[in-house]
Structures are given as structure tokens and as C-alpha cells.
């Protein structure tokens, strides 16, 4: 019962915040939860969902390359600019932080609750997008490391 109230609360916040992605996500999970035969799929979604999402995002990012909108010329031009190097550095940083964050979530699954809550606040009230839980867990890992608070260490 508690899980239903939690999901309904998130759905209500998503509706008030007019966040379509969160509305669809919560609704899909609620429908799956209603069907007893989908419990294994829910576990699979929990363990592999982020990987599936990253795959979809990666494919979307590749479309301009596939359509010819972006080619080697654009890559060379961006490498010549300070903004391009900053973007490359940020990409590297996010990849490393995400890897650390996934490790933190594996060591301390209860951290997921706080990250999800923070993500919901950011999505609904600050008009963010829910692509950040893994990055947020990476930032959390860095901060916890600085203060020597990483669970399991």
C-alpha cells in the first residue's frame, strides 16, 4: 500500500508540475505494478532501465551524424574553440562521475531514495529533466569521498 501512495504522490506532483516524462514514467510503472505477471519485468527495468535510456539517448545523439548534419568538418571546428574543449572536458567528467555514481548506488541502494526525491524536485519545480540521477549519484560520490563518508569504505 505504501508504494502505491508514494507513486500516486509522485504522479500528483508530476501533474501539478506538468512534467509529461515523469507522468508517463510513473503511469507506466503503476500499470506494470497492477499486472502480477510483470514483477520480473519491473526488476529488469530497475536493473537495466538506465542502460536502455542511455542507449536511446546515444542513438538520438547520433542522428545528426547519420543524416549528414554533423561531420568531420564540424568536429574539427569545435576542437578549435575553447567552448569545444570545455564541452569535451565536461563530457569526460560526466562519464567518470556517472561511473562512480553507479558504483555508489550498487554499494548503497538506499541512496536511490534521496536521489529520486532530489530528481523529482528538480524536474517538477525547476523544469529540469530526469536524465540526472546517475550524474547526481556521481556528484554525491565525489562529495561523500571528500568528507570520507562513502558507505562501505
From Swiss-Prot:
It is a multi-pass membrane protein. The chain crosses the membrane at residues 4-24, 52-72, 85-105, 115-135. Its main location: membrane. It comes from the Bacteria. It is found in: Cell membrane. The keyword Transmembrane helix applies. Signal peptide: none annotated. The keyword Magnesium does not apply. Keywords: Cell membrane, Membrane, Transmembrane, Transmembrane helix. GO terms for cellular component: plasma membrane. PANTHER family: UPF0756 MEMBRANE PROTEIN YEAL. Belongs to the UPF0756 family. HAMAP family: UPF0756. This is UPF0756 membrane protein LSEI_1366. It comes from Lacticaseibacillus paracasei (strain ATCC 334 / BCRC 17002 / CCUG 31169 / CIP 107868 / KCTC 3260 / NRRL B-441) (Lactobacillus paracasei).
